[in-house]
Each structure stands twice: as C-alpha cells, then as structure tokens.
Amino acid sequence: MKERPAARIGWFGLIARLGLIVVAVALGSGASWAADEIPQYSVWIVESSRFMNVPFGPFMPDRAFIPGSNDPKHNINTVDLPVNVGVIKGGKDIVLYDTGWKQQDYLKMTGSEHWAPIKDQLAPLGIKPEDVTKLVIGHGHWDHAGQLDDFPNAVLYVQREELHGIEWALNYPHPKISAVNTSPGGCMRTPACGYPPLTVDQIYGKVLKGKAVIVDGMMEIAPGLIIHPAFRAHTAGSQLLEVNTARGKLVFGSDAYSSWEAIRDWMVANVQQTDTVQQFLAYEKCYRITGGFDNCVAAHEPLSYSDKYPLTKDWWTGPNGSRLAEIALAPGEQSRKPK
C-alpha cells in the first residue's frame, strides 16, 4: 500500500511521524538472533471481560442460527465471547499482546460482564503493571488497546498502517451514523466507533511520550518474538505476534482471527470491518508458522477456557469471575494455576 501524500496525512499522521523519530534512535528497527539465543517463553491469557449473549450469526455467518435445526452448526442462537489478553514472559521481557479495555460506557452499551482492571488480573501471575516492558496491540480498537496508560514503563508497538486507519476512521463523514434498527446511540458498525476518544488518546499518548515503536510490516522485537503484518484482516494495520514456547510456536491473532473454531474450519468471523480475503491470509500465515491451527491464539473464541479449545484447557477463575489460562511454561518457570 502506498503511503498517503503528505497533504492528506493530517494531524495524526504528523504525530505518528514525530513519534517514529523519537523512538527510532533509541530502539532501532529489530534484530536477528542465533538459534541458541532464542528463549522459550511462558505464556498465559487473561480474560479482560466477556461479551454476553452475542448472536452467533453476526459474529460467524457460517454458524447462523436456524430455528428448529438439528445441525450443530446452526442450532446455537447466542454465545458469550471473551476478550483475551496474551501475557508473555521470558528473557528480559514481559510482553502483553492486546490490553483489554476499561471504557465504562462501552461496558454498559455492550452488555459485557466479568470486567476487572488489568492490574488485578495480572496479580495472580505475579506480575505488576510496572514490570511490563512491551505492549503489542493486534489493532487499535477499544476492546484491545485500552488500559495502555496503566503500563508506564512499557513501549507500545503499533503498525503505521493502523495509525493511518485511525486517522481515516476519525475523518469518516458521519462517524455516529447508525442503521434505522440500531439502538439509539449505537454506532458499533461504523469505522469511528472502534476508536473512541479514550483509546485514541492512549495510543497517541504513548507516541508523544516517546514510548512507541511505529512498525512497518514485520519486526523481531526480542529473540523469538516476531510481529507479522496482517493488514486489513480486521483493521488497516492488524498485526500478529509469533512466540517461541516449549509447546512450539504460538501466534496471537487478536481479531485477524477472532475465533479459533473459524480458523480451524476455515470460516470468517467478526467481519464487520474485515477484508475476508486478508482474514483467510492471516489464517494461512498462522498455519505456515505453527504447522496447523492448534497454536493459533484467538481473541474472542467462545470455546475459550474449556477442553474444546485445548490451548486454553488449563484455566481457573480470576477477579470478578474473569478467567485465566496457562498455555506454556518456560524451563524453570513455576505454574501459576492454583492447586
């Protein structure tokens, strides 16, 4: 994709360029390490919150509910969708992939439950917010890129294309437009609604403070931690994160693949702002990196925290009924799962 002409970049684009200058000198653009220098990371996921009673069809069209159907693909009306945050520990780093959210007005609007502050959800893992060194957001939507300012020492990794996408969304002609049958004030199907003021403020706050790396495509941010672009698989600058672990390589997908069941069965999911071809290419990228679908970590899989999503079967209940799962442990790492 060609970069936009300077005259069209706008205020946000200029900030992004300034941020790149600020961080590039200090942090560079990634590096390569020898195989014996690549650690195996410990990995957990925590549930930032849970969207309750979501109609299955709009989330995954191939699973649309058909009244009276005996087909297991079409006899489920609603599902609960977790908002999963990846926690990665190893080497000199503690990394979060996505950060959940805390916009209380959206909490009410979406009918979400089991939300808890991220610092409380990290506590059972023995991690404090100030210990976190890197934040990789799969994309900049409110339920994935909130709470950034809770991590004062962490550097944010965001794609330049995502910043351009945010700028475009905020210049959308009618950002609050909604369908006739949408609830009053509801605007969740329009581009701008993915980027409410608090989220945008926190993303660009990191940039302005010199605590961000603006990524152009692929980048190895630490030994065994590799960002892969998945542009337009959900938003303009979606990105995946490859993680080296004792159970093989994992790839976190955020909403580039919201559902593990979808990537397993090759179905689109969460498609309101998605280029479906690019979503399938994101699926393919995870298959290529991991060798299959088992190690693809999805953001909103309804089967999360159960044996039906094997990656998350070692789970327990955390603050306010949220859930945590232990996915992989590095050599010498103690389990955090309560006995």
What is each of the regions a protein language model found here?
Residues G13-G28:
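Bacterial N-terminal signal peptides
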Residues S112-V158:
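Active-site metal-binding motif and surrounding structural segment of the metallo-beta-lactamase
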Residues M109-S112, P173, W266-Q272:
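Short glycine-enriched, charge-decorated loop/helix-capping segments at active-site entrances
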Residues M1-G13:
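N-terminal secretory signal peptides that target proteins for export/translocation
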Residues S32-I127, D131-K134, E161-P229, R247-D255, ...:
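Metallo-beta-lactamase
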